[in-house]
Amino acid sequence: MHFMKRKHPCRIRKRADFLAVRTGEKRRGPLFLLEVKSREQTAGIKSPLVARVGFTVTRKNGNAVKRNRIKRRLREAVRVGLTDDIEAGTDYVIVAHSDALHAPFTFLISELSRRIKPKTKHQKRQQGNMNGI
């Protein structure tokens, strides 16, 4: 039986691109911080409109083996669960927390898909009302 491979999204690899995304919107979650920035907002970068994803795992998450495992899990979660949800012309940087190493893979995918989708005005208003209580 032949299984169709899903295409990996483009990766962010340059420091300047990571720093540019840091100025964008931040969406916090229990397993990671997702930084999102539209490339139209980033001046001077001329590239085809494809979605790009970068991964950051800091040294406080453990030794190199643990950090690499977290990155592999996140890369696979993006490939399997999010290739249809990510917006073309947008850069995403996932800053992992140490909990991403031991979280169930299905939970990792569901958290990523929840954070990737932009909030509507109605959801933002509801969240604002909850913070005021």
Swiss-Prot record:
Function: RNaseP catalyzes the removal of the 5'-leader sequence from pre-tRNA to produce the mature 5'-terminus. It can also cleave other RNA substrates such as 4.5S RNA. The protein component plays an auxiliary but essential role in vivo by binding to the 5'-leader sequence and broadening the substrate specificity of the ribozyme.
Pfam families per UniProt: Ribonuclease_P
Keyword line: Endonuclease, Hydrolase, Nuclease, RNA-binding, tRNA processing
Any GO BP annotation: tRNA 5'-leader removal
Record field: catalytic activity: Endonucleolytic cleavage of RNA, removing 5'-extranucleotides from tRNA precursor
Recorded name of the encoding gene: rnpA
GO cellular component terms listed in the entry, alphabetical order: ribonuclease P complex
Disulfide bonds: none
Subunit field text: Consists of a catalytic RNA component (M1 or rnpB) and a protein subunit.
Species this protein is from: Bartonella quintana (strain Toulouse)
Family recorded in the similarity comment: Belongs to the RnpA family.
Name by which UniProt lists this protein: Ribonuclease P protein component
PROSITE patterns: RIBONUCLEASE_P
